From Swiss-Prot:
This is Aspartate--tRNA ligase. GO terms for biological process: aspartyl-tRNA aminoacylation. CDD domains: AspRS_core (cd00777), EcAspRS_like_N (cd04317). L-aspartate binds at residues 174, 220, 443, 484. Its EC number is 6.1.1.12. It comes from Streptococcus equi subsp. zooepidemicus (strain H70). It catalyses: tRNA(Asp) + L-aspartate + ATP = L-aspartyl-tRNA(Asp) + AMP + diphosphate. Keywords: Aminoacyl-tRNA synthetase, ATP-binding, Cytoplasm, Ligase, Nucleotide-binding, Protein biosynthesis. It is found in: Cytoplasm. ATP binds at residues 220-222, 229, 477, 529-532. Its main location: cytoplasm.
Length: 582
């Protein structure tokens, strides 16, 4: 029989109609000779009533066989419920069953199919098809579909062209590790799965496409955390002849449209802009969460002359003030914060508490001479807790930035209903890699340096600034973009600054350098992490919750057992051998 509608769509206006529904048995209850079934489908739950006085013996026998997650087809008439259930959208009605067919049976599931069930992440991923039956999971994917629909319509209306770029590309040395794909035809050679369509979308600008977009899969072989996956989806944009501001205006309009159409929230435009240095110095992060204060304070000069070498000899001494919560943190709690601080390179964590106008704590005795200045500078009051880090400026900023976020979560200081967008601009072009012992691109090597700092490509690389911009939401980097290099000589200078020889640059990027000899227009763009955006819209804290079949923290899939061994025959065809090292 043809399904009349979704179970979750049945309402009062359908009373008196005979309909056919199909779905899963969510729950069965036997009460006073009647059998009650909660039928679940994609759109919700509907109560079925099976009365032995109204159905044949066969139907009743079938009903008695029903168990959770059986797939069934039912026919019956919609009636008003004697006692409405306000918790259900269908709670005013029920279906009086006249016909029932079991379409498939089900084993006892490894966990109950309902929201809020306690089950391990690996079990959820092992039985992902069951996990996805839960209503909150379905809602997340409806939200994701709505988000991509809004984005496509918005960009289509602005004249952007949706173009698919290759999945098998050339491996490049910058950035994260590539996922490599061996070529059977060109043996000994490898493709790479794209970390982004960066170069190909730039080449589309050279081709005259003017405005490109793509909702595209990307791949990075990197260590995983809550907001990262080895394969992820991004909203990729590129434009020709537009300024940094014009590109940001387009992106802001897109985000505003998504927020209005998916959440019913009007966001204020334009988004605030914050310089990279200000973000690091005041928030300790290049992706600051501006929903709460607790700013980093620089005390380096104030404590320079005190008799406490940890402070007086440090490159930087910075602090955060936890207002009015000193009594919430015992010595044991502060020890935990100290261990947390060490994860970010800090040697330790100094602290003091303010009680009735006096300082208490291990370092209080060293601060006697600057107590009044410190109180005034930090605007200290009774029951304040002050946490200090004395180290390099980078370590102090990073450590206190992480502590700031951790403490705000512990103390419920964050308004979770807020969506605070901002742009982080004025980025450094390069960042120093301790591991590589060289400067590397802060974004990528195709980013345009500012006209004022480009001369430092042959001088002090720390002084080179980029025409780059990141969009940030609630402490998460949603995406990043920049104006790109379109002149061959500038691109060659960039490669030299990164340590490429002319031969290496030509081997890796010769096709791009050649393209720059054929009228490459000024261009720029941006990419936004779709998974991360939907995660935040859905109020989740892990992008696995908005990816249908994600990997676990070991980059493996407990359901399919990927990655897996392959046969010797497959390896022979590729002329590959696996060496095992103890």
């Amino acid at each position: 029989m043809k399904r009349s509608m979704y179970a979750g769509h049945v309402r009062k206006e359908h009373i008196g109609r005979t309909i056919v529904l199909k779905g899963w048995v969510s729950r069965r209850r036997d009460l006073g000779g009647l059998i009650f079934i909660d039928l679940r489908d994609r759109e919700g739950v509907m109560q079925l009533v099976i009365n032995p006085e109204d159905v044949s013996g066969d139907v009743m026998a079938t009903a008695e066989r029903l168990r959770s997650e059986y797939v069934i087809e039912v026919e019956g008439s919609v009636e008003a419920r004697q006692q409405a259930n306000d918790k259900l959208a269908t709670g005013a009605v029920e279906l009086k069953v006249s016909g029932l067919t079991i379409l498939n049976t089900a084993k006892t599931t490894p966990f109950e199919i309902k929201d809020g069930v306690e089950v391990s992440d690996d079990t959820r991923l092992r039985y992902r098809y069951l996990d996805l039956r839960r209503p909150e999971m379905l809602e997340s994917f409806k939200l994701r579909a709505k988000t991509t629909h809004v984005i496509r319509n918005y960009l289509d209306n602005l004249g952007f062209i949706d173009v698919e770029t290759p999945m098998l590309t050339k491996s490049t040395p910058e950035g994260a590790r590539d996922y490599l794909v061996p070529s059977r035809i060109s043996q000994g050679h490898f493709y790479a799965l794209p970390q982004s369509p960066q170069i190909t979308k730039q080449l589309l600008m050279n081709a005259g496409f003017d405005r490109y977009y793509q909702i595209v899969k990307c791949f990075r072989d990197e260590d995983l955390r809550g907001d990262r996956q080895p394969e992820f989806t991004q909203v990729d944009l590129e434009t020709s002849f537009l300024s940094e501001q014009e590109i940001q205006d387009i992106v802001e309009g897109m985000i505003a449209k998504v927020m209005k159409d998916t959440k019913g929230i009007e966001v204020k435009l334009p988004f605030p802009r914050m310089a990279y240095d200000d973000a690091m110095n005041h928030y300790g992060s290049d992706k600051p969460d501006t929903r709460f204060d607790m700013f980093l304070q620089d005390l380096t000069d104030l404590v320079k002359e005190i008799d406490f070498k940890v402070f007086s000899e440090a490159q930087a001494v910075k602090a955060i003030v936890v207002k009015g919560h000193a009594d919430r943190y015992s010595r044991k709690d502060i020890d935990k914060l100290t261990e947390f601080a060490k994860q970010f390179g800090a040697k330790g964590l100094a602290w003091l508490k303010v009680a009735d106008g006096a300082f208490t704590g291990p370092i209080a005795k060293f601060l006697t001479g600057v107590e009044s200045k410190l109180t005034e500078s930090l605007q200290l009051e009774h029951n304040d807790l002050v946490l200090f880090v004395a180290d390099t400026l980078e370590v102090a900023n990073n450590t206190l930035g992480a502590l700031r976020t951790r403490i705000a979560k512990e103390l419920d200081m964050i308004d979770m209903s807020q969506f605070n967008f901002l742009w982080v601009v004025d980025w450094p072009m390069f960042e120093w890699s301790e591991e590589e012992e060289r400067y590397m691109s802060a974004h990528h090597p195709f980013t345009l340096p500012t006209a004022e700092s480009a001369h430092e490509l042959e001088g002090d690389l720390a002084k080179v600034r980029a025409v780059a911009y990141d969009i940030v939401l609630n402490g998460y980097e949603l995406g990043g973009g920049s104006l790109r290099i379109n002149q061959k000589d500038m691109q060659e200078r960039m490669f030299r600054a990164l340590g490429f020889t002319a031969e290496e640059a030509n081997e890796q990027f010769g096709f791009l350098l050649e393209a720059m000899e054929y009228g490459f227009p000024p261009h720029g763009g941006l990419a936004i992490g779709l998974d991360r955006l939907v995660m935040l819209l859905a109020g989740k804290d892990n992008i696995r919750e908005v990816i249908a079949f994600p990997k676990n923290n070991k980059a493996s899939d407990p359901m399919t057992q990927a990655p897996s061994l392959v046969s010797e025959k497959q390896l022979e065809e590729l002329q590959l051998q696996i060496e095992h090292h103890d």
